């Protein structure tokens, strides 16, 4: 087995095909960036809901737009996505002979560029939305938010039953392709690369030199602009390029920070972290009647602040500590993504059901 593994490693190194470690590392790069940015946006939204709340509500769409600008910038200038270029890889058209391959600095052909952009940006966006839909429907089904006569009841229950198997088949498809790639039976580690009609290869020294040369020429060259339309087009092109370059620089710095955080919070370092960051337990608050004079709060503590009736299925918001009826606060949070009393950004997962001794 060791000899066969060494043979595979030697063959992959001799060829321009990257190793499984390189392709898996570049795949995990953007996967780590998304939750990191999401956490930053969440902190901003909680600190100032009026100014940054929209970033949290529309995070998926904003991230997808910025991701598209970033990936399109790299695909058209380096023939690679951001993470692939970061690890010194490029995309080449599958099945093309070596002497007919385009240089990496020329970018991908339009057909392969748009296919690559769709699988890099649009597909992850749809997958995230599908996961959120499944989570929301599962929550509604668990607490019977929909009335029994709802015509969508059969549909969403069938969706919830089928989704785990579809997701398992999807992940199994990718795992099978990676195993075939390790064994040298496939030239694509991901089925999406095959669907896009490209494969990954290592950047050569000539590719790196050509990419640097193109960047220098692009910054030094000033094209004469005649008509107003050309001026607008040139300005938009420069703006998009500037945004993509800023994102690229920021992500390149952030990647090292993310790797440090990953090391810091790894299981091997937990004992050392606990000894370094251990602090004494803070004293309890003097009282818990904060903002008790608010007109939104009822005088009786057993009354729901939303429906003004005796609470049913007591549920507390983890973001503010106020208690409501489950049905009332679920519908409010789902519509407004905020606490009804404080306005703090809130999601459905922040609802915590309470079970009193009387029940």
Curated annotation (Swiss-Prot):
Membrane topology, record value: Multi-pass membrane protein
Positions contributing to Zn(2+) binding: 304, 307, 325, 328
GO-annotated molecular function: ubiquitin ligase activator activity; zinc ion binding
Pathway annotation: Protein modification; protein ubiquitination
Name recorded for this polypeptide: Peroxisome assembly protein 12
InterPro entries according to UniProt: PEX12, Pex_N, Znf_RING/FYVE/PHD
Function: Component of a retrotranslocation channel required for peroxisome organization by mediating export of the PEX5 receptor from peroxisomes to the cytosol, thereby promoting PEX5 recycling. The retrotranslocation channel is composed of PEX2, PEX10 and PEX12; each subunit contributing transmembrane segments that coassemble into an open channel that specifically allows the passage of PEX5 through the peroxisomal membrane. PEX12 also regulates PEX5 recycling by activating the E3 ubiquitin-protein ligase activity of PEX10.
Regions that span the bilayer: 20-47, 52-76, 110-139, 145-183, 250-277
Keywords (A to Z) from UniProt: Membrane, Metal-binding, Peroxisome, Protein transport, Transmembrane, Transmembrane helix, Transport, Ubl conjugation pathway, Zinc, Zinc-finger
Gene Ontology BP annotations: cellular response to reactive oxygen species; protein import into peroxisome matrix, receptor recycling; protein polyubiquitination
Peroxisomal matrix side: 1-19, 77-109, 184-249
ZnF bounds (RING-type): 304-343
Domain notes: The three subunits of the retrotranslocation channel (PEX2, PEX10 and PEX12) coassemble in the membrane into a channel with an open 10 Angstrom pore. The RING-type zinc-fingers that catalyze PEX5 receptor ubiquitination are positioned above the pore on the cytosolic side of the complex. The RING-type zinc-finger is degenerated and only coordinates one zinc ions, preventing E3 ubiquitin-protein ligase activity.
Compartments (UniProt record): Peroxisome membrane
Species this protein is from: Mus musculus
Subunit relationships: Component of the PEX2-PEX10-PEX12 retrotranslocation channel, composed of PEX2, PEX10 and PEX12. Interacts with PEX19 via its cytoplasmic domain.
UniProt record similarity statement: Belongs to the pex2/pex10/pex12 family.
Ranges per topology, Cytoplasmic: 48-51, 140-144, 278-359
Cellular component terms (Gene Ontology): peroxisomal membrane; peroxisome
Pfam families per UniProt: Pex2_Pex12
């Amino acid at each position: 087995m060791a000899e066969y593994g060494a043979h595979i490693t030697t063959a992959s190194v001799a060829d321009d095909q990257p190793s499984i470690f390189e392709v898996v590392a570049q795949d995990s790069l953007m996967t780590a960036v998304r939750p990191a940015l999401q956490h930053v946006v969440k902190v901003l939204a909680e600190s100032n809901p009026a100014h940054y709340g929209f970033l949290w509500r529309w995070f998926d769409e904003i991230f997808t737009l910025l991701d598209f600008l970033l990936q399109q910038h790299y695909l058209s200038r380096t023939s690679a996505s951001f993470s692939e270029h970061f690890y010194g890889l490029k995309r080449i058209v599958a099945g093309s002979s070596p002497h007919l391959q385009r240089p990496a600095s020329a970018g991908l052909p339009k057909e392969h560029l748009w296919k690559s952009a769709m699988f890099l940006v649009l597909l992850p966006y749809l997958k995230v939305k599908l996961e959120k839909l499944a989570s929301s429907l599962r929550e509604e089904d668990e607490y019977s938010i929909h009335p029994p006569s709802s015509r969508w009841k059969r549909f969403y229950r069938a969706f919830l039953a089928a989704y785990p198997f579809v997701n398992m088949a999807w992940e199994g498809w990718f795992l099978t392709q990676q195993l075939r790639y390790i064994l040298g039976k496939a030239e694509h580690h991901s089925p999406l690369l095959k669907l896009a009609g490209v494969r990954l290869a290592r950047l050569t020294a000539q590719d790196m030199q050509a990419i640097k040369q193109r960047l220098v020429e692009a910054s030094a060259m000033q094209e004469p602009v005649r008509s107003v339309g050309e001026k607008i087009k040139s300005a938009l092109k420069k703006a998009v390029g500037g945004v993509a370059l800023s994102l690229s620089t920021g992500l390149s710095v952030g990647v090292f920070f993310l790797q440090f955080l990953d090391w810091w919070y790894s299981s091997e370092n937990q004992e050392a972290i606990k000894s370094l960051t251990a602090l004494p337990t803070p004293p309890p608050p003097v009282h818990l009647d904060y903002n008790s004079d608010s007109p939104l709060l009822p005088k009786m503590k057993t009354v729901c602040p939303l429906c003004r009736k005796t609470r049913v299925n007591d549920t507390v918001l983890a973001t503010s500590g106020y208690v409501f009826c489950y049905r009332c606060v679920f519908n409010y949070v789902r519509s407004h993504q905020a606490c009804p009393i404080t306005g703090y950004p809130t999601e459905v997962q922040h609802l915590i059901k309470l079970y009193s001794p009387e029940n």
